Each structure stands twice: as C-alpha cells, then as structure tokens.
C-alpha cells in the first residue's frame, strides 16, 4: 500500500455506557423477535466490555517513503483509514502497535513489501505477531527480525514473532500463545496457535463457558462435541460429565486440544480426529476406522451433544444426527441459521435456556446459545 493512495486519520467515535446499552438492547429485541414463534424462557443477556475486548486484530500496512502505519478499510466506502490506536482491540495490542512500528521503521529489510500485521493477544500477557510480506524472506530478514524480537522482549513484551510469505513461514520462537481464562472461579489454560481459530472476545468466552457449565450442571451420562477446535468448550465442560468424546478434523487443532487436556489435568476427555459423518458411521457400527483402535464407543452413553457450527449453521444431515440426543447445547454465531435449524429441532426438542452473548459489540453480529431438552412423550 503506497503513498499514492488517499489515507484518512481514524476518527475514533465518542461512545458512552448509554450508547453501549442501547446497541445491546437493540440486539436483545432483534434476537427475541427472530425466535418469536418458539416458546422461550427468559433471555439471559451477557454484556461485553465496551472497548478493548477483541484479542485478535489484523491491519494492512501503509508505506509513506521510509515511514509506515497501520491502516484499515472503511466498510462502506473502502476508504483507507490510518489507525494509530484501535479501542476495539486489547490493551496489549494497543500498547504494542506503536512500539512495533518504531522498531520496523529504521530497517528497510523489515519494511520492504510488508503488507499486513496480525496480532493474537491474551489476558495472560502473551502476544504473537505475524508480519506478512509480498516477497521471499531471506536470512538477512531473519537476522533483523530476531534483533527486533529481542528488543521488544527487552521492553517487556512477552512476544512471539513470525514472518510469512508465499509458501513460507519463519517462526522466531513459538507459533502459539498460552491463554488463561477464569470460569466460575477456576482457571483454565489454553494453547492458541497463530493463524487458527480462537474465540476473539475473551471476556465473552469466559461467560459462554460459565453459561454452558451452568446449563449442563447435574447432567447424566456422557457428552459428545462435534468439531471441538482446541477443546475450548469440551475441556471446561468435562467436569459436568462422566466422560466426553469430541471430534475435530484439523490436525493443528487436535494437537492444541491434546496439549490443553494435559495442561488442565482433564482425564475423562478423548479427542477423535474425524468428521461428524465418520463418527456417525462408527457410532452406528456401519464402518470401522483405524483411528478408533483402543476406543470402545460402546462404553459411552452420550445423552448430551454440543455443537458450535460456523455461520452457515448445521447442514440437514447433522441436524438429523443432533436430534438423536436428549439434550442439545447449541452455540451459534449466526442466530438466523440457528432459527432455521430450530425449525427442525423444535419438532422434537424445546428450548430450556436461551442466551445472548455480545461477542461483537458495535456491530450487527450476535452470538446466541440455546439448551434444548427432548419433549416429553
């Protein structure tokens, strides 16, 4: 991104607590309206911090001669906006942003064809920074980047620095950070890997985990989770169940989940690297898988299933699979697809608990949670 393009200063909006409450009330009304055709319990609303809530941020880089700045595109106009501070992002990201640019400016080898910087921060104080380039990274870059990382660490940042280019990734330390979340008074440890999915709002993540624990309190039998990622939910929920089975297909996520199981001393959770479709075939005895050697599926009585699908929601086949379970815990990042899935799930199950999580304040997006129980008779 070059100086020939127009760049505007970031006009940070002045927002008050009343403004935050107003946007939260609008989401509450919209969510209740979306589910007006269902018999609903009282909606449980979980508010976010109004600023410094986002643990991840990505910025394009604008070059002006020997200088450079973070910038973003305005959603409506696509205008390039210079960003010196970003109140949406964590305080740690905001602290590092100017210091990192200060470290990059004197070094052409670090600046040249740098087009994006990604930040992954934690509440624990650790942060991972990825520098993305439109060129191959040579040994000269690595030497300069190692010096930059050492300088930033000397300034008090518990930082991991990564360089990325086409088909190239150079990790100068680790490619992950360790997050610590407090859930119902208990501290949970999570390995979060660069460039893989993690919950963006740590405060809301803690509230979602606490809510999931509360709604499944006193559960009988075992839990099945489909596509568990790094074990974010299954590790927290394991204390409420005799045993937990979780599936995940991405190897980096499975590796992180195994690390997190050990780090949290969980001894009743098994992660299976397989798809929901494969697991269904195995559970019904339709096919055998080498990956299940040593796992006795017959020893599990999964009365409860947990799903946290992408924005598209559950496909028709998975909805039918989920209906087989007495209790369904469903976290949705798109209540419209949750509503569509509920058109089917509502035939057999009723909504026992209903929650709104303000994962993305100041945006249209909402996160919703429902706990469904099989209808009597």
Curated annotation (Swiss-Prot):
One Pfam family of this chain: tRNA_U5-meth_tr
EC number(s) given by UniProt: 2.1.1.-, 2.1.1.35
Catalytic activity: uridine(54) in tRNA + S-adenosyl-L-methionine = 5-methyluridine(54) in tRNA + S-adenosyl-L-homocysteine + H(+); uridine(341) in tmRNA + S-adenosyl-L-methionine = 5-methyluridine(341) in tmRNA + S-adenosyl-L-homocysteine + H(+)
S-S bonds: none
GO biological process assignments: tRNA methylation
GO cellular component: cytosol
Gene3D superfamilies the record matches: 2.40.50.1070, Vaccinia Virus protein VP39 (3.40.50.150)
Keyword Metal-binding among record annotations: no
GO molecular function, one term: rRNA binding
Similarity annotation: Belongs to the class I-like SAM-binding methyltransferase superfamily. RNA M5U methyltransferase family. TrmA subfamily.
Function of the molecule: Dual-specificity methyltransferase that catalyzes the formation of 5-methyluridine at position 54 (m5U54) in all tRNAs, and that of position 341 (m5U341) in tmRNA (transfer-mRNA).
Name listed for the protein in its UniProt record: tRNA/tmRNA (uracil-C(5))-methyltransferase
Gene behind the chain: trmA
